[in-house]
Amino acid sequence: MSSPEQRDEVEMLATMLLIRRFEERASQQYQAQKIGGFCHLYIGQEAVVAGAVAATRPDDYLITAYRDHAHALARGTSADACMAELFGKATGCSRGLGGSMHYFDKANHMYGGHAIVGAHVPLATGMAFAAKYRKEDRVTLCFFGDGAINQGGFHEALNLAGLFKLPVIFICENNFFAMGTSVKRSTSLKEIVDRAEGYDMPGEVVDGMSFREVRDKLGEIIASIRKDPHPAFVEARTYRYRGHSMSDPASYRTKEELEKYRLEDPITRLRAQLTREGKLTNEQFDKLDKSAKEQAMASVKFAEKSAEPPLEDLYKYIYAENDETSEPAPATGRATKPAGRGTSAKNRRATGRTASTNGDSA
């Protein structure tokens, strides 16, 4: 398994560049009306997920909210599968049925992508409980925005995690705005990290614009959790350069504020650090950036050529039933035939089960 020391920083810079170029290309495709529904971009926040993933092992669990493209890419989901999902194609990481807010990649232990604000936080607690119950050496990373910290389920989940000493890290990506509402107008506490004290778990603040600070602090916390399981809370102070979603002009922010944070661009900062230390040349950076742009462009072409999900698959993945459970699509961007079709809708009605959907919206 990889450790933080083994993760090459140049490799993680390449991941951050891929996230940036993918999101820029997604923005263009959304404006061209090739992507429907909602689309939340991660531009500016790349250091948070890159640093966190660099501190984990591939078998650790990861779950996040609706701004999820970057988390999938950082965990190893292909750009092809990610873009195809945005296009609603069968080769997408959720077979074209999830869209932007519902990425899923079981092979890389990336469990969403959840549209309802804060609704996935209890799931993270459950995943950590399962790992501890099974005596698995796994840590769960749960990402959410500052807008989730006042949801009821958030408090219940952190209380149980603290009570049962579960191996989970709750990572608040505090970009200072819940949609257009400043955190100062929505939260009584001056410091979000102070929430941790109420659940008897350690709390840390990190500069979310610094890859190294995020990686190093998460590495320390994870090492502590592996030694003696317990939950932790991390407030990563970061900034998104775009609006809340593609429909948001972000008029609630000043140009001066935006320019201030652009000077702290996480990609520029890591590049400068590596260059000063003699680990990266300008030519090497240009090559990394070119590769990221090519991958993003290739993902668009892949998505355009991919097939639509067949109509008969519309209700196929609602139920998981014993040996007929359908496995999720692999993260290669290629569709595979599901293991089974499951029970028909008619038979389900006959058993008296009520239908449920995963069609969350926000």
Residue map of PLM features:
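A general secondary-structure junction signal
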Residues: 66, 236-238, 318
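A ubiquitous, low-specificity "background" feature that marks scattered single residues
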Residues: 52, 74, 132, 179, ...
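Short secondary-structure boundary/hinge segments and terminal tails
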Residues: 47, 73, 179, 213-214, ...
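Generic preference for hydrophobic/aromatic residues in regular secondary structure cores
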Residues: 101-102, 176, 201, 318
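Cofactor-binding active-site loop characterized by glycine-rich and histidine/acidic residues
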Residues: 24-28, 32-164, 182-188, 193, ...
